[in-house]
Amino acid sequence: MYKLEIDNLSVNYGVAGGAKTLALSQVNLTMERGDFVVALGASGCGKTTLLSCIAGFMEPSEGEIRLSGKVVRGPGAERGVVFQKHALMPWLSVADNVALGLRLRGVSRAERMRVAHEKLAAVGLEDVAGKPVYQLSGGMQQRVGIARALACDPAVMLMDEPLGALDALTRESIQALILKLWAKEQKIVFFITHSVEEALFLATRLIVMTPSPGRIAHTYELPFARRFIECGDARAVKADPEFIRYREEIIDLIHATA
């Protein structure tokens, strides 16, 4: 079973011999299969820096990250990333975009296309597999990005504000899609957002981070994602008095620590 361990992680920004900024300070976090962890906090609290370290895009200044006991020293196929901007290749078809990671790993075209169509079906886009991505709406492009991240069957899904640029209705539909995929595949998910409501709805565990330097100020274990999987009614979940109480408490906490 996969386990992601973040042990006393600190990150300094700056140049050798010059002034440095402590972006993250002594972050400790453990995630196991089926955990959906959401990081929430004011701008500058280190959320994206933390995700970049987990992805292997950055090296920590102190501490380490381990995936199933192995220290993370760079990007790897066991960690899929979905960015705020979809980062798709506009000259490729939808299916070829989804299959890109498999192509780079030397997988045969027949197998790449089989997996691409399977993952596109999972996000409701199998009918547009042959289209160029520039013909798709923003929400559809982001679903292609999710399918691409799933194509290599990663143990960990890293999602850096993937819904921030979408309209409210599209955002809600993709939130529901993400939870259904998580419930089915039981991957570790680490998700960044600025939306308190989105964080409460998606997270099984919510970490609220403080800035200057970035630290985990508070951790919440939450029931709402699993409630949605059971009932399928997002509006009912978000209208629950317990959901509203958590929302107000967390907004107050973020204001107090910003």
From Swiss-Prot:
It comes from the Bacteria. It is found in: Cell inner membrane. SUPFAM superfamilies: P-loop containing nucleoside triphosphate hydrolases. GO terms for cellular component: plasma membrane. Disulfide bonds: none annotated. It is a peripheral membrane protein. Residues 4-236 form the ABC transporter domain. The keyword Nucleotide-binding applies. ATP binds at residues 41-48. Its EC number is 7.6.2.7. Keywords: ATP-binding, Cell inner membrane, Cell membrane, Membrane, Nucleotide-binding, Translocase, Transport. PROSITE patterns: ABC_TRANSPORTER_1 (PS00211), ABC_TRANSPORTER_2 (PS50893), TAUB (PS51250). Pfam families: ABC_tran. InterPro entries: AAA+_ATPase, ABC_transporter-like_ATP-bd, ABC_transporter-like_CS, ABC_transporter_ATP-bind, P-loop_NTPase. GO terms for molecular function: ABC-type taurine transporter transporter activity; ATP binding; ATP hydrolysis activity. It catalyses: taurine(out) + ATP + H2O = taurine(in) + ADP + phosphate + H(+). The complex is composed of two ATP-binding proteins (TauB), two transmembrane proteins (TauC) and a solute-binding protein (TauA). Belongs to the ABC transporter superfamily. Taurine importer (TC 3.A.1.17.1) family. PANTHER family: TAURINE IMPORT ATP-BINDING PROTEIN TAUB, TAURINE IMPORT ATP-BINDING PROTEIN-RELATED. Part of the ABC transporter complex TauABC involved in taurine import. Responsible for energy coupling to the transport system. This is Taurine import ATP-binding protein TauB. It comes from Cupriavidus necator (strain ATCC 17699 / DSM 428 / KCTC 22496 / NCIMB 10442 / H16 / Stanier 337) (Ralstonia eutropha). The gene is tauB.
